[in-house]
Amino acid sequence: MVEALNAVYPYDLALLPEDYEKTTAPDAVQAANAARPFLNPVYPYQQPVAGDFGFPIVMPPFFNSYDFTSIHGNTLSLRLNKPLKRTAKGLQLLLGSGLSVNADGQLESSEGISEADAPLQINDGVLQLSFGEGLSVNDHGELESKGKVEAVTLPLALQDHVMSLSFGQGLQVNDQGQLEALAMVHSTSAPLKVTNNNLELALGRGLIVDDQGQLRLAPNLLWPESPLAIEQGTNHLILFYNQSLDVEDGKLTLPEPFDPLTLDGGRLRMQLAPNSGLAVTEKGSLGINWGEGIQVKEQKITLKVTPANGLAVTEQGGLNINWGNGIKVDEQKVTLKTSNEFALTENGLYLTSPLNPIEVNQHGQLGIALGYGFHAHRGYLELTPQTLWTGLPIGNNGTFHTKQDCKIFLSLTRLGPMVHGTFMLQAPQYELTTNGMREITFSFNSTGGLEQPAPVTYWGALDPPPTAKAAEIENQKRVKKRAAPDPPVEPPPKRRGDLAVLFAKVAEQAMELAKEQAVQAQPPEHVNTDWADHMNLLRFMPNTLVYPTAATIAANLQFHDTRLSLRRATLKIRLNGSPDSAYQLGFMLELVGTQSASIVTDTISFWYYAEDY
């Protein structure tokens, strides 16, 4: 019998059979092994010592999970992957087609190799390696490099043309020249610790390691109190709980509560409906948001009642209304007492049969049904103006070349489907030649409003004849204005000599000019610029179907004869025809058979179809 190291606890020497195959190591290796101390391959790597109860402490085996595995909880076994498997005869190799084991137990190929991928090739049934320049096979059949290695990459290193492997802590090269990991643990994390190069498990109160090396609860654990208990048979610590608690993923939680409660971040919270009148105070109490008319009196919710507002509380605690004339209760509902001329509906009180022209508008307001040509303004029923004009051109109101250098008169009056127009131009300081003149254009927007810059200073509606009441009010304003005395004008200071007289005349002329300009800056009384709010200005615009926009055709032009200083001329009127504005009226003079004439026209009338016709 031969003695050998037993790798199973208690790690004594096992007796092996005589025919156990044993490899004899070289003398140097045997001497090195003999000098080494006895190695226990199981944690804690030393002879077991007696514990508190006098028995040896059995620690669990320390093994690498990549090479070993645990079977049935306490048996250490090798971790196997294919092509290895366990059988009743021991560890065997799984063989596929083309492989077999001969009588000497050696693995060999039972089929010839027919094909091979480069750099391998088959010659006469022999597998050979193809290699190029720089490689050769030495006398020992080994592949070697003919040249010298000039450079390598990490973790390889090159020194004196010798290639070596660089490695750090935790790795070493053994006597056989193989790279292996050092069996030393340098650092751990709790509950593991290293003592004298041994890995240990730090145990607290209530934990022990049993004879099988397994971690268990200590038998002297204090008996738990309710709601904790020890389950019989399993010795598991359990917790008793009722239906108000639940266990989810091994954690004690609250189950989903019934409305109006909900869980918010693991905390129980009450859901309050919006506009419910309920709120949670700063102290966490449920309260009521008090509105106006509500109060708490003697810890009771009650109404705030003001008797002066017609409300009262009866002796029975009910809310009552002090009734006045015109109010009654009908079928337990407060309603109005109405006469035969009025009726109550779901929409309110209305006249049963208003006589024309009385009506109730869409806003429920009583008024007069207004037809074409009438409107309500300033509290009176008035005629809607039928004329837009520049006003009487008493002073210069137009622009020929410069501002207010001429008089322009334009009047547009609506009559049925037609608009009657009147035009006059007076610019006596200018002469018209055979070349004609530039066009005077009135441009209007999509609602009929005059666009700026305009050729005239003022543009508005002609006030219709006022009513008797309105005329009386305007007359009182004029009388009051006349009664107010003009402010005194202080005379200019007296100066000596002709120069002082000249300065006085210049100052007097400047004051008269300023007064004239101030008068011209105000619109004439017969031009009302506020009528646009009461008029449909499109009624005065040229019809875009008859006179198209952006189309200079014959239908857009009218030609009228006139006189310029007793000389014959033609006034060309253009209706629309420009893409720059929604509506346009253009006026241009042309001489007939003469060289020049002063620009002073007659009053010229023209007609066209209105836009809303």
Curated annotation (Swiss-Prot):
GO cellular component: host cell nucleus; viral capsid
Assigned keywords, A-Z: Capsid protein, Host nucleus, Host-virus interaction, Late protein, Viral attachment to host adhesion receptor, Viral attachment to host cell, Virion, Virus entry into host cell
Biological role: Forms spikes that protrude from each vertex of the icosahedral capsid. Interacts with host receptor to provide virion initial attachment to target cell. Fiber proteins are shed during virus entry, when virus is still at the cell surface.
Protein name: Fiber protein
UniProt record, GO biological process: adhesion receptor-mediated virion attachment to host cell; cell adhesion; symbiont entry into host cell
Localization in the cell: Virion; Host nucleus
Organism: Murine adenovirus A serotype 1 (MAdV-1)
Region described as Disordered: 474-496
UniProt keyword annotation of Mitochondrion present: no
Additional observations: All late proteins expressed from the major late promoter are produced by alternative splicing and alternative polyadenylation of the same gene giving rise to non-overlapping ORFs. A leader sequence is present in the N-terminus of all these mRNAs and is recognized by the viral shutoff protein to provide expression although conventional translation via ribosome scanning from the cap has been shut off in the host cell.
InterPro entries tied to this protein: Adeno_fibre, Adeno_fibre_knob, Adenobir_fibre_prot_rpt/shaft, Adenovirus_pIV-like_att, Attachment_protein_shaft_sf
SUBUNIT field: Homotrimer. Interacts (via N-terminal tail region) with pentons.
Comment field on protein domains: The tail region anchors the fiber to penton base capsomers, whereas the shaft, built from several repeated motifs, allows the knob to protrude from the virion.
Regulation: induction: Expressed in the late phase of the viral replicative cycle.
Coiled-coil residue windows: none
